[in-house]
Curated annotation (Swiss-Prot):
InterPro entries: Chorismate_synth, Chorismate_synth_AroC_sf, Chorismate_synthase_CS. NADP(+) binds at residues 39, 45. It catalyses: 5-O-(1-carboxyvinyl)-3-phosphoshikimate = chorismate + phosphate. Homotetramer. FMN binds at residues 127-129, 245-246, 290, 305-309, 331. It is an enzyme of class 4 (lyase). Reduced FMN (FMNH(2)). This is Chorismate synthase. The keyword Flavoprotein applies. SUPFAM superfamilies: Chorismate synthase, AroC. Its cofactor is FMNH2. GO terms for biological process: amino acid biosynthetic process; aromatic amino acid family biosynthetic process; chorismate biosynthetic process. Gene3D superfamilies: Chorismate synthase AroC.
């Protein structure tokens, strides 16, 4: 499978094309729209989210609620385009002077993109913007729906925002609280501290980052491969996660703390039970060993840096005069960590489904489902 996206933050539309999805898979448009709406939510979001009401339009590749095997084309309308139509026009009528950006923002693609592509900063930031992730959520939700039909579950939580760290557990009640929380946390006391921290950051013109966790459950062992470097599933998941705007680090299982322990404290002892087959007594590896799933939940943690646009701007250099000035201010969020969690779940889902289709090549949903169930039976009998 593969996909491409196109579109600018303030252009008329975001578009996506994906191919390689088996035919006959059930796809529900409302479920995609719900994921898009979830991405728009969360404390700390900016004024743009009050303008947009993201919904997907399926242009091809799905008929009667089932994939056809043809490329799937998608689009999302940018409602804010109405306010930028003259500025973002493609022809000679474009107003190139209004909203021109001459003071690049530290931490953003502005300056480096300006140097690399020899184009205006406006053109750089329009494509580098995290607005692009709306389409990646839509594309990834197609993968989510197929994975769920196979019995695979993807969940996530926010572990920390700024200096506030959450107490985490793994019970049905806890995950219900996470799902109901605007912050996507299961710690009520922590949620109160997050609200207070957000108000402090907003009053100071600051922004906030955080640490997020994704869990992928009910995967069979053997997805990915140790045979070549580019087939290792943890490497591919890491690349997908790090490709999301503002994500600066990724870890699996124990992550970087593994370097602080003896090997006997890190590696997961193997057990066997006639009912469940082989299993691990712990999951410090985060569900991946040798680049392959081992049957335990895949646990991914990622760190999101604070958003580069600050309402109390840092210093920068004017591209024309070379004078030191304050960086430009674009309309932005104070905190988008819960929204980033939605994006990470969906980019991870795409990589997981791709790994499944590499192990079980299939042109149709029925072929994929049969291969998955046959292998599941084989694993349980070993």
């Amino acid at each position: 499978m593969r996909y491409l996206t196109a579109g600018e933050s303030h252009g008329p539309k975001l578009v996506g094309i994906l191919e390689g999805v088996p035919s006959g898979a059930k796809i529900d448009k409302e479920t995609i729209d719900q994921a898009l709406q979830e991405r728009q939510k969360g404390p700390g979001r900016g004024g743009r989210m009050k303008i947009e009401k993201d919904q997907i339009t399926i242009l091809s590749g799905v008929r009667g609620g089932l994939t056809t095997g043809a490329p799937i084309a998608l689009e999302i309308i940018n409602r804010d385009w109405a306010n930028w139509e003259k500025i973002m026009a493609w022809g000679d009528e474009a107003d190139l002077e209004s909203r021109k950006v001459m003071t690049p923002r530290p931490g953003h693609a502005d300056l480096t993109g300006y140097l690399k592509y020899r184009t205006e900063v406006r053109n750089v930031l329009e494509r580098a913007s995290a607005r692009e992730t709306a389409m990646r959520v839509a594309i990834g939700n197609i993968a989510v729906q197929i994975l769920e039909a196979l019995g695979v579950e993807i969940r996530g939580q926010v572990l920390s925002v700024g200096k506030v760290h959450m107490d985490s557990e793994d019970t049905p009640e806890y995950w219900q609280r996470v799902q109901a929380s605007e912050w996507k946390v299961g710690d009520p006391k922590g949620e109160e501290a997050l609200d207070a921290q957000l108000q402090e950051a907003r009053s100071q013109g600051e922004s906030l980052g955080g640490v997020l966790q994704i869990q992928v459950r009910n995967l069979l062992p053997g997805l990915g491969s140790y045979v070549q470097w580019d087939r290792k599933l943890d490497g591919r998941l890491a690349q997908a996660v790090l490709s999301v705007q503002a994500i600066k680090g990724v870890a699996f299982g124990m992550g970087f703390t593994a370097g602080q322990h003896f090997g006997s404290e890190v590696h997961d002892p193997i057990g066997y039970d006639s009912g469940r087959g082989y299993y691990r007594y712990s999951n410090n590896a985060g569900g991946i060993e040798g680049g392959m799933t081992n049957g335990e939940p895949v646990i991914i943690e990622a760190v999101m840096k604070p958003i580069p646009t600050l309402y109390s701007p840092l210093s920068t250099v004017n591209l024309e005069t070379k004078e030191v000035m304050e960086a430009s201010v674009e309309r932005s969020d104070v905190c988008a960590v819960p929204a980033a969690l939605v994006v990470l779940k969906h980019v991870a889902a795409w990589e997981i489904l791709q790994a499944i289709l590499e192990k079980f090549p299939a042109d149709t949903w029925d072929e994929l489902d049969k291969a998955w169930q046959d292998y599941k039976r084989f694993v349980s009998e070993q």
